[in-house]
Amino acid sequence: MSQVFKVAVLPGDGIGPEVMAEALRVLDAIEKKYDVKFERTHANVGGAGIDLEGKALPETTITICKTSDAILFGSVGGPKWETLPPDEQPERGALLPLRKIFGLYANLRPAIIFPSLTGASSLKEEVIAGGFNVLVIRELTGGIYFAQPKGIEGEGRDRVGFDTMRYSVPEIERITHVAFQAARKRGKKVCSIDKANVLSSSVLWREVVTGIAKEYPDVELSHMYVDNAAMQLVRWPKQFDVILCENMFGDILSDEAAMLTGSLGMLPSASLAEGTFGMYEPSGGSAPDIAGQGIANPIAQILSMGMMLRFSFGMVDAADAIDNAVAKVLDQGCRTRDIFQEKPGEKLVNTKEMGDAIIVAL
């Protein structure tokens, strides 16, 4: 009897439904190839949730997610909902509560340049010749974004705004284990990012990470101040394998690393809880300017689905097959508009045609 996994499918807004459709077609192909069954339940989120059910994260959606093994998330947001109070807008009203409800503490964002796409990067080709593959692991639930006290006090020009940057030993330990376990399956290097020369929380961060590293003698650990890391990512990204960051530093560096690749439409992400539950989504936004035109790049959504197979369902072979199929299609010259450079051998394709090519390559 086939193994059965339950997936909550949240397409969201903008290009979300279009790219999600291609990811689900690839999932159909995986079902046939690996004799497995994915029970999919669609639910509203973001602007779609607001329009159809009155809030960005409806209770029905939460219930569906709670009865699923993983969440496959599209994208949320758009100009239509920007006039709502900030906490009710699609991004803050959906993503932050999902992270809190499901304890999603570890964000994994690969920044990959495939060898056939080095010309799309903003970096000089000699810096990234042969491509690169960096994994940024960001702690999601602690640090300056969440620690108390925070706020604005006083009146007029006497007002003061303040935030607290706080980390506990257990918070640092669990994200560090995620980084080292990931590095063991890759290039066996972890670079931990901090600002230990000025921040007390970073002093503790470095101390705890150094201690945990002793449990992984096969993995090389280095430390780097965040300002230097921002520079080194641009100077020589291939020096990195796994980059371990607290929340704010990871927020900034993961976006920087992503843009080095040339297109956010290529980059997946995973947000993991304790155990095997996770939420998987593209790193890019909802791109309302191209929604409905059938030209969006579905690769990030497809690779996010591949990360779901790898991290939540333990289907490493299937995840590798998806990664290899995407690489093969790119080597064959298939390009959506965002990565099309008009080079010899390139073929401009739409959203569905890119999905078709990846399914054939599988």
UniProtKB/Swiss-Prot annotation:
Mention any Pfam family matching this sequence: Iso_dh
Cofactor requirement: Mg(2+); Mn(2+)
Q: How is the cofactor bound?
A: Binds 1 Mg(2+) or Mn(2+) ion per subunit.
Give the EC number: 1.1.1.85
- InterPro entries, sorted: IsoCit/isopropylmalate_DH_CS (IPR019818), IsoPropMal-DH-like_dom (IPR024084), Isopropylmalate_DH (IPR004429)
What residues does Mg(2+) bind to?
Answer: D227, D251, D255
Lineage: superkingdom: Bacteria
UniProt KW keywords: Amino-acid biosynthesis, Branched-chain amino acid biosynthesis, Cytoplasm, Leucine biosynthesis, Magnesium, Manganese, Metal-binding, NAD, Oxidoreductase
* UniProt pathway: Amino-acid biosynthesis; L-leucine biosynthesis; L-leucine from 3-methyl-2-oxobutanoate: step 3/4
| Top-rank EC class of the record's enzyme | oxidoreductase
Q: Which GO terms are recorded in the biological process aspect for this UniProt protein?
A: L-leucine biosynthetic process
Recorded catalytic activity of this chain's protein: (2R,3S)-3-isopropylmalate + NAD(+) = 4-methyl-2-oxopentanoate + CO2 + NADH
Instruction: Look up keyword Magnesium and say if it applies.
Output: yes
One Gene Ontology molecular-function label: NAD binding
User: Where does it localize?
Assistant: Cytoplasm
> Site annotation (Important for catalysis): which residues?
Y145, K195
Q: Which GO terms describe its cellular component?
A: cytosol
- Enumerate the residues binding substrate: R99, R109, R138, D227
Residues given in the record as NAD(+) binding sites? 78-91, 285-297
- Transport listed as a keyword: no
The job of this chain, per UniProt, is described as: Catalyzes the oxidation of 3-carboxy-2-hydroxy-4-methylpentanoate (3-isopropylmalate) to 3-carboxy-4-methyl-2-oxopentanoate. The product decarboxylates to 4-methyl-2 oxopentanoate.
State the oligomer form and interacting partners.
Homodimer.
Family (UniProt) = Belongs to the isocitrate and isopropylmalate dehydrogenases family. LeuB type 1 subfamily.
Query: What is the protein's given name?
Result: 3-isopropylmalate dehydrogenase
| Taxonomic source organism | Geobacter metallireducens (strain ATCC 53774 / DSM 7210 / GS-15)
